[in-house]
Amino acid sequence: GYSKSIELGSVGDIRSVIRSQQWDLVINCVAIANHEQCESDPSSARLINQELPGMWADQAWQSGSRFVHFSTDAVFDGSSADRYFEDDATGAPSVYGQTKRAGEEGVLSADPDAFVFRTNFFGWSHDSARGILDFFANGLESGASMTGFRDYVVSSLYVGHLFELMIEAL
């Protein structure tokens, strides 16, 4: 596979990666997804969640590559008693949701044919410490007391299934 360290926010570095090969597909799944981190460091959230996706999409579009961007259901305000659809009004109350929505807009402005997957997914993290499955598995294994939410409704999708759906959509 391809691996290269780049300076986040550097259009030159992004361009270098995109133009290093003829990519059929460029997938952006980079994000600051920790809501608390976004609230405490909104400037980093704006760079990673809002500005970078459009930069990647623009460079992919210029090189003729298809572009996929992963967003979130947190772009909605959560006030609906029913499920949300793509064309429903957004109105995220959090920095995370606001920056992810702005990132979607940047992607679609740079490449109107880009795929934007607005989803909530789960899976195992590479270090077994950061995903929701890791949280519960590690907590159960250690006998730790865990608390959750009773008033939060979400329809999460396993990342393996999300990948299959993405391939099917392309």
What is the predicted role of each segment?
Residues G1-E7:
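A short beta-strand-loop structural module common to alpha/beta enzyme folds
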Residues S3, R46, H161:
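Catalytic phosphate/metal-binding cores of nucleic-acid and nucleotide-processing enzymes, i.e., regions
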Residues L8-Q50:
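NAD(P)H-binding glycine-rich loop region in Rossmannoid oxidoreductase-like domains
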Residues V17-Q21, Q59, G106, L165, ...:
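CheY-like receiver
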Residues V26-V30, F67-D73, F117-T119:
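SDR active-site strand-loop-helix element
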Residues S40, L47, E51-L52, V75-F117, ...:
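Catalytic helix-loop patch of NAD(P)-dependent Rossmann-fold dehydrogenases
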Residues Q62-R66:
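A short helix->loop->beta-strand "cap" motif at the edges of active sites that frequently abuts
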Residues E105-V154, V159-E168:
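NAD(P)-dependent short-chain dehydrogenase/reductase
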